[in-house]
Amino acid sequence: QNAGIATAYQEVNLCTNLSVGENVMLGHEKRGPFGIDWKKTHEAAKKYLAQMGLESIDPHTPLSSISIAMQQLVAIARAMVINAKVLILDEPTSSLDANEVRDLFAIMRKVRDSGVAILFVSHFLDQIYEITDRLTILRNGQFIKEVMTKDTRATNSSA
């Protein structure tokens, strides 16, 4: 985190017994003279959610009551709290349906457009071609090659 690198994993790594806002701000809660200022903490969480277009999520909502897809977006909002320069998303679409993937990609584009580099790990080639600028191919953990995604599209459409 100190290096500006944040991660969101395939299996959502959040605390289901906490609220959305508490998860977003975990470890970065706003403090007052008598400890954590929950009002300011939830206000800050709301700000981070809004930056990602997630104004509809109430930070007081129990995390356990929202869908896995929404939890994935909360995990990304949590990553943004540290002002990440790089966001690593490890198989974030593996348990999402097509509509949820579309929503996630819209959020990813917002994050990217804010200047954050995104490393998107996936086995779904159609998603890779849709969302990435550059493609790095690994086989058995070994680097094979790196190409610009746009340079592969002509090959893929004719295959």
Where on the chain are the PLM-derived regions?
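Glycine-rich phosphate-binding loops of nucleotide-dependent enzymes
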Residues: 1-159
